[in-house]
Amino acid sequence: MASLCSNSSTTSLKTPFTSLGSTPKPCQLFLHGKRNKAFKVSCKVTNTNGNQDETNSVDRRNVLLGLGGLYGVANAIPLAASAAPTPPPDLSSCSIARIDENQVVSYSCCAPKPDDMEKVPYYKFPSMTKLRVRQPAHEADEEYIAKYNCAVTKMKDLDKTQPDNPIGFKQQANIHCAYCNGGYSIDGKVLQVHNSWLFFPFHRWYLYFYERILGSLIDDPTFGLPFWNWDHPKGMRFPPMFDVPGTALYDERRGDQIHNGNGIDLGYFGDQVETTQLQLMTNNLTLMYRQLVTNSPCPLMSLVDLTLFGSTVEDAGTVENIPHSPVHIWVGTRRGSVLPVGKISNGEDMGNFYSAGLDPLFYCHHSNVDRMWNEWKATGGKRTDIQNKDWLNSEFFFYDENGNPFKVRVRDCLDTKKMGYDYHATATPWRNFKPKTKASAGKVNTGSIPPESQVFPLAKLDKAISFSINRPASSRTQQEKNAQEEVLTFNAIKYDNRDYIRFDVFLNVDNNVNANELDKAEFAGSYTSLPHVHRVGDPKHTATATLRLAITELLEDIGLEDEDTIAVTLVPKKGDISIGGVEIKLAIVKLVCVVNLLTLQLNKDRFCYDSVFVCWFVCLFFNFHV
C-alpha cells in the first residue's frame, strides 16, 4: 500500500482553490374517503384560533397525497416552499452549523467561497471511454483495497498541507455538515436535504464528485467507490476493509456493535434485538421488501418525498427512513457514551449528520443508498422518476476534482450511466421476499379492542397499543385495487428532533405481538427519525410528521379484504412519541399528466392553493394532457 501511494505527492497538487476566498409521467395520488364525500373549494382556511390564514396550515390530505409521498406533508406548507425550485446555497451567508439548539459545531463547515458566485458555471459531464463500476465492498480484493486506502490517504494529507483545498477530506466531510445541520439558509429558511425530496439527488451528486476526486488523486479515472451491500445476506456485516486500525479507511468513532462479525440490523435504533442471526437476516430482507416494494408503488409513495423547501413538516421517503437511518445509527457511537477524546457522544461519527462524512464508511453506505434508487426503478410498475419541474430544476453547489466550483441540477443526475458510472450486477433476494407466515390464525376480534376514536389523539406511545379502525371500502375488485391504493395514515406524529425515533405498525395482531420477528404478513412498516436540525430557533425541538402505509397487499395476504373493520397495533421501539390521529383513505394511483401549476402566477404576490388543487383535480378526472 505504501509503495503504491509513494509515486506522487499530494503537496504538488495544483488546483484553482488558491484563488478562492474563505421519462414516463409520474403517478399522482389523490386521497378519497367515502366515495360520496363532497369536495369543497376555498382559498381561505380557518385555523384553531378562528383566524383566516391564506398561506399556512393548509391541510390537503383529502385532495393530494402526491404532495406528501409515503412520508409526506401533513400540513403547513409555507407559500415560499411551493413556488420555485430550491436554489443553490449562498456561500456568503453560510453560518455556524448546529448539533442541536444548544450545541454548535466547534469548527466551520462552510465551503471555500468562489470570488463571484454569479459566475459559477453549470457542470457539464466530461467525455468518457469507460464506465466507472462500483463493486460490493465485501468482494473487494487486496489490490482494490490498497488503491482505495491510498486515495483516501492522499485526500487526508491535504487536510494538513492545504486545509482550505475543497477536495481535502475534511472539506468534503463539511459538505454534509453544512447542508444538513443548518449551515445554509435561503430567505430565512434552513436548507435541509434530509426529510425532503432533495435527499437522493443531493447525495448522488455528492458521491459523484467525491468519487472523481479519489480517482484523480491516484490518477485512475476508472476508480469507483465500493458499496456496502447491506441488502444482501453476504453483505450484512461491517465491511472488513474499514475496520483495520492505522489505515485511512478506519475511524475510531464507531460503535462496539460493528465488530466480531455481528450482523447489521437494518431497523436498528440504539438497542440490540434479542434474536438469532438468522432471524435478524430475515428481518432485514423483510424490511427491504416492505420499503422498496410494498410501500413504494410509485415515486410519490417511495424514494422521493415531496416535502418542499421551507416546509415545517419533517418527513422522509421509504429508503431514507429504513434502512438509511438505522445503518447510520448502527455504525456510530452510542449517544451519551464517552468518545476517545473524553467528550460525550452525540452519535459521532455516523450517527449524527454533522460528523457522518468524517467516517470513510459514510460514502460506502451512501453508495448503496444511491444504488437503491436504481434498484427501485428496476422493480418496474409505476416506479419512475417524477417529472415535477421544481424538483428537476433544484440546484446544489460542489467543487470538482480540480477544485473548480460548479452548480448542478437534479435533472442531470437521474441516469447514473450518463453520469459515467454503474453498479456491479448483484442479486437482490429482498425483491421476492414477501412475508407469507401469519402471526395470527384468524381475524382478531375487533370488538374486543377500542376503536381509534377512543385511542387518538394519543398523548404518549409508551407501550404496545391496539385499536380497531373502519375501512372506506371492502370486497374491492382487482380493477378497483389497481386504480386505488388503500393507505393507512397516521397524522400529527410529534417527537423531539434531538432523539432517535422508531415505532412499528402491525395489522390483525394484538398488543402481545412479537415485534422482534418482522417476517410476518401482518407487519406493515415502521416510522423512524435521526437527530437533526430542521428549524433553527425552535426551543421545543418538536418535529411533526405523517406516516402513510400502503396496505392493499397486506390485506390480501392476511385475508381481510372483505372486512369492514380491521385491527391495528403500534409497538414503540425508541423515543417519546405522540400521535394526533389515524385514518384509512383510498389513493388513486394513475399515470396522468403533470401540469407545472406551481409556476402559474395566479397572483404575483402569492398563490391561491385551492385554485391550484382544482386544476390538478381537473387534470386527473378529465385526463387532460399537455
Curated annotation (Swiss-Prot):
It comes from the Eukaryota. PANTHER family: POLYPHENOL OXIDASE A, CHLOROPLASTIC, TYROSINASE FAMILY MEMBER. Its main location: plastid. This is Polyphenol oxidase C, chloroplastic. The keyword Plastid applies. It is found in: Plastid, Chloroplast thylakoid lumen. Pfam families: PPO1_DWL, PPO1_KFDV, Tyrosinase. There is a cross-link at C180-H194 (2'-(S-cysteinyl)-histidine (Cys-His)). Its cofactor is Cu(2+).
